[in-house]
Amino acid sequence: MTDIVFSGPKSAPLTVALAHGAGAPMDSPYMDAFAEGLAARGLRCARFEFPYMAQRRDDGKKRPPNPARVLLATWRAVIDEIGRDNLVIGGKSMGGRMASMVAADLESEGTPVRGVVCLGYPFHPPGKPDKLRTEHLETLKTKTLICQ
């Protein structure tokens, strides 16, 4: 299980779990500022790292992101540990995309999260504007905020 770092009060009415993007860790200046901003507004923020980023933290070697199945399984493990009650999931770029995908899966299983927030959604791979990554968003009923 990946380590989860919490900011904000345990008694908060809402927890926002955030995953990092493909190239920067959970404690990048962007992620720190976002988590601190949520905590300052009385919300609880939970951050974690996908396995490839945790390995990079251990040995300093840059790696590509894990396959989507590993990223989605990591998200599910984090959600199971935190609990779905009053939980919004999201993240930066790739982390938000994976959150939206797992939210769609959970919704279809009848165990949805409260919402999704994507901070810079990667609508298509770099240099491939014709290859959209949005099919699951077309039917997603979970409240979703995408900030570009």
Which residue ranges define each predicted feature?
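Serine-hydrolase catalytic machinery in alpha/beta-hydrolase-like enzymes
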Residues: 1-87
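Charged helix-capping and loop-helix junction motifs
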Residues: 129-138
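Gly/Ala-rich beta-loop-alpha elbow adjacent to hydrolase catalytic centers
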Residues: 91-95, 99
